[in-house]
Amino acid sequence: MKVQSLLRIETQLLLGRLLTRSGDQAWDFVVPFALLVIFPGKLQVAAFYYLIVKIGTFLLTPSSGKWIDTHPRIQVVKWGVWLQFFAILAGMVFFGMLDGLVRAGGRESWLLSVLFIALALSGVMASLGSQITDISVGNDLAPSLVAPEKLTHFNSWLRRIDLATEVGAPILAGALFAFHPEQLPLAGLFLIGLWNLVSFVPEYFLLRNVIQRSGLKIKVLTEAQSWKDTFHINLRGSFSDPIFWLILSYALLWLSVLSPHGVLLAAYLKDEMRLPETEIGLFRGLGAVFGLISTVSFPYLVRRLGLISSSRWHLGFQGVTLGIAVTAFAMGSTASVYVFLGCILLSRVGLYGFSNGEFELRQRLIPEGRRGELNSLSSLTTTSATLILFSAGSLLPQTEDFKYLVYVSLAAVLLANVVFIKWSSRQGVVTSGAAEPVES
């Protein structure tokens, strides 16, 4: 008997998620370090790389969503997984060529710029493939295959996997990257890349098996006549959909610098608050730990209050804790700094809980034929918020002016509460399929 036949469909989906996320997190963690090995002291090179990846993904996101809706599931999974595979493989090749060129004294060569752009474009393709796979698994296969009464439990396990890989994969990747021969400083990068490549193979066969066993090869497809049609995006139609206000409420939370994982907050704590790196690192690690609490609190409140009410309570909790955090921040004393950081950690319970709720509401409410379009719109809005936030951060004349971003962050979270309450008050009883009530 095949091993795959012994695993439930839900288990196969979760295992596929674990494989892809662990590799993605490890690769993303070491890429900036590898760039700094090749270009020591040039932090702007790593920043420029990620800017290209973010902008490229931003531009291609709407088209990828429409493409998902116009193609069979098996084809979507195949393209998503193998696009990542060949993009990571290309990235390894370009890293090796860049390192060889720089070692040979070719810093002034035109080929250096060409290889760097090629590396960044491979990063865009890897990001796009990851996004296609995430939407296919989390926003299409999961709501189609997982029983409605099990969906909250399934999503909680998805979140646990995401948080576990967010913490564990970088630790393992950092250890691999640190140990290398002197003659081959990127040996760790290549090992991590190989780990990533190997993980794509079982992931693809797991997802293909899920689709074939479930009989979901055929889905309601949106008509698309050509590639030109795929790249013609009707954003006005997406924005006018009622689900947009749900998506917007979540995207507003990405306009916040009040995150343990935020680059801007970490820089402020180091430069202005003079906190040691060990405390900042502990703060970052605890952020994921507090996020795990939501994987217990959210399902519990769903059983007690229903999906929408649980989402409201978690989002409201985030607003209250960040309100206290910003009040402590405004006081400016040494003790209040730790109150500020403690409340940010508590707010992660609310943030991740609401994230679970918003994710499940999209799973239940978006019709099959528009899952790619509207879920890619969600990615588009969160990416836009990230770009806006970093653009605002780059315009700050002094580190101390970071306080304005803190106040804007609180305003964005409170506005998210208003938007979600207004949207959810019009929903009544949310159903999945024909008659599975979400509110109890």
UniProtKB/Swiss-Prot annotation:
Give the UniProt entry's GO cellular component terms: plasma membrane
Query: GO MF annotations for this entry?
Result: iron ion transmembrane transporter activity; metal ion binding
Report what the protein is called. Answer: Ferreportin
Provide the cofactor note recorded for this chain's UniProt entry: The cofactor facilitates a conformational change critical to the transport cycle. The binding of Ca2+ from extracellular fluid activates the transporter by triggering a conformational change that enables the transition from the open outward to open inward states.
Similarity field: Belongs to the ferroportin (FP) (TC 2.A.100) family.
* Native organism taxonomy: Bacteria, Pseudomonadati, Bdellovibrionota, Bdellovibrionia, Bdellovibrionales
Native organism is Bdellovibrio bacteriovorus (strain ATCC 15356 / DSM 50701 / NCIMB 9529 / HD100)
- Phenotypic consequence of H261D: Complete loss of iron binding. Completely abolishes the transport ability
What happens upon changing Q84E?
A: Complete loss of calcium binding
Query: What subcellular compartments does it reside in?
Result: Cell membrane
